[in-house]
From Swiss-Prot:
Homodimer. It holds the Pfam family tRNA_m1G_MT. CDD domains: TrmD-like. It is an enzyme of class 2 (transferase). The gene is trmD. InterPro entries: Alpha/beta_knot_MTases, tRNA_m1G_MeTrfase_C_sf, tRNA_m1G_MeTrfase_TrmD, tRNA_m1G_MTases_N, tRNA_MeTrfase_TRMD/TRM10. It catalyses: guanosine(37) in tRNA + S-adenosyl-L-methionine = N(1)-methylguanosine(37) in tRNA + S-adenosyl-L-homocysteine + H(+). This is tRNA (guanine-N(1)-)-methyltransferase. Specifically methylates guanosine-37 in various tRNAs. S-adenosyl-L-methionine binds at G113, I132, G133, D134, Y135, V136, L137. It comes from Thermodesulfovibrio yellowstonii (strain ATCC 51303 / DSM 11347 / YP87). Belongs to the RNA methyltransferase TrmD family. SUPFAM superfamilies: alpha/beta knot. The keyword Cytoplasm applies.
């Protein structure tokens, strides 16, 4: 799978791509990321990419010409592309969209803005706008890396163990279950006995139950289209939680 990133900070992108799961996937040829320095597509000796906004106002706006030149250049190879603008106005990125992108045959090209944004005429060059959340960042580089990382880890061979990505949070509609490793006990906190039992069926049920518990407590909005078995587990959890609340309410208070 091929990604492209248009940015004024190519070293920012390239540094991240050297490490971790994404770095290994690139070394194995599972994915490819081409980074383009927007300043290479300017026409003045100062390699200027921004200017004052028409109508006044604070900050600077990125000019359309460098983006236009860069996009025309990369399109000259004739490959099919989906050009994506990273923008707080875009569609919210999530795990479902990451999975959809893994099936995309086109090159995914990410446009990274800076300053107060990009000249509105950039919209005539893009296919889609994507946001990673309702907050303000200094530029589109972090969102581009978030999306690339999220997609790459879903590609066959990227994680080594194919079950790893299947069991990630959100892949089955829930948050993840708790994870433990050695030592069995740390400062009085023990690993749940069920995980040491070797009974894989019971462990799977425990993990499903704990994933539902975490989702119910932290992201109840994700609890949709539950199976009958999940509904049964959820009802048991609700009874358990309500019982705990009542017990806590009746505990004596020491003044």
């Amino acid at each position: 799978m091929i990604f492209e990133v248009l940015t004024i900070f190519p070293e920012f992108i390239e540094c991240y791509l050297k490490h971790g799961i994404v770095g290994r996937a690139l070394n194995r040829g599972i994915a490819q990321v081409k980074v383009y320095n927007l300043r290479d597509f300017t026409t003045d000796k100062h390699k200027k990419v921004d200017d004052y906004p028409y109508g006044g106002g604070a900050g600077m706006v990125m000019q359309i010409e460098p983006f236009s030149n860069a996009i025309k250049h990369i399109k000259s190879d004739g490959k099919k592309r989906k050009i994506i603008l990273l923008s707080p106005q875009g569609k919210r990125f999530n795990q479902k969209l990451a999975l959809e992108f893994t099936r995309e045959e086109a090159v995914l090209t990410f446009i990274c803005g800076r300053y107060e944004g990009i000249d509105e005429r950039i919209k005539s060059f893009i296919d889609e706008e994507i946001s990673i959340g309702d907050y303000v960042l200094s530029g589109g580089e972090l969102p581009a890396l978030v999306i690339i990382d999220s997609i790459v880890r879903l590609l066959p061979g990227a994680l080594g163990d194919e079950l790893s990505s299947e069991e990630d949070s959100f892949m089955k509609g829930f948050l993840d279950y708790p994870h433990y490793t050695r030592p069995e006990e740390f400062e009085g906190m023990r690993v749940p006995e069920i995980l040491l039992s070797g009974d894989h069926k019971k462990i799977a049920l425990w993990r499903r139950r704990e994933a539902l518990r975490t989702t119910f407590q932290k992201r109840p909005d994700l609890l949709k289209n539950l199976s009958q078995e999940d509904m049964k587990i959820l009802k048991e959890l609700c009874s358990e939680i309500n019982k705990k609340i009542l017990e806590d309410a009746h505990e004596p208070v020491n003044n």
